[in-house]
Amino acid sequence: MGKCVMTGATGHVGYALLLELLAKGEDTTILIRKESEIFDGLDCKKAFGDVIKPETLEKAFEGADVVYHSAGVIELKPGNEDLVYNVNVNGTKNVVEACKKCGVKKLVYMSSVDTYPPLPDNQVMHEISHYDPDILEGVYAKTKAEATQYVIDANGTDGLETVIIQPSACIGPYDFKTSSIGEMVRMVIKGHFPVTITFGMYNFVDVRDVAKAAVAAAEKGRPGECYLICGEAITVGEFIRLTTAALGKKEPKLKLSKGLADFAAPIMEVYYKVTDTTPLFTRYSIRKLVSNCNFSNEKARKELGYDPMTVSQSIKDMADWIKDFEANKKK
């Protein structure tokens, strides 16, 4: 594959991608803002920079054949809209332009299923060719849609080929930064998650499957194309049941209805902002949980050889990893 450079290596998907590239023996450079012990012992090169600082990208991308762009901000609580836009949109534009200037052959961009407007009546959703932020809700979805369209439009310019992969809700190991799902697992471990949620469902995918799909996209993805990288859709209640079972915990007896969640969400949003903690429930996330999540991965299976693991295995691996990670932090 030649020289690979990747952004977002400290993230949930990014770290899994780094391990996948190294396991395949790829010459890999990671773009990071500062040193981190999570890279200790890994055979990768480091370039220091930031996607919102374009002058740092050209030096990092020099001589690269493939760039994987997974850096981004997933923000559920309100108040950080400018940061989200700057990283997700401007940062992606900076990456694209640096790829062109440096003669990069292929860019693989990590988009999201959130860029899709939900279809009614649980209709199956397949890949689309145009992404419009104005018909979406939430700053994350809007910024990822705008960035995705920019990457599509960049395909074929200045010798650059672009491929986009679009994961659903990511689970699995390597949750160093504590995602919303990871926060829930940590609360279950501590016995601080007292309720079973009686509404909503979502589509989940393991970060290791996303990483494999990203590499496959670089190797055989069609230029200018998007690929939905999703797994199983299960109810939130089933997710909690599988998580508690994986950790040997009892399933909570208290039930949280959508009505109660709707009532509590505005209060919780203030709490998350004041305490600067990872949000579990916001008004936006509740709406997402009750919207259509019936995504098809048929195209990725056919063209990329995508074959995701079961959600139960992924949840178990995530729970085991978080349990070990938190225990080691206390030593």
Regions found by a protein language model. Give the residues of each.
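Glycine/proline-rich active-site loop of Rossmann-fold NAD(P)-dependent oxidoreductases
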Residues: 158-160, 172-183, 217-227, 249-251
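Substrate-positioning beta->alpha
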Residues: 94, 179-180, 197-218, 225
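A conserved pocket-lining segment of Rossmann-fold NAD(P)-dependent short-chain dehydrogenase/reductase
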Residues: 133-135, 185-205, 209
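Mid/C-terminal beta-alpha module of Rossmann-like enzyme folds, strongest
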Residues: 213-279, 297, 302, 310-331
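Conserved Rossmann-fold NAD(P)-dependent oxidoreductase catalytic core, especially the SDR/UDP-sugar
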Residues: 90-140
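N-terminal Rossmann NAD(P)H-binding glycine-rich loop of SDR-like oxidoreductase domains
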Residues: 4-24
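Active-site Tyr-X1-5-Lys
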Residues: 136-163
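NAD(P)H-binding glycine-rich loop region in Rossmannoid oxidoreductase-like domains
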Residues: 36-40, 44-90, 98-101
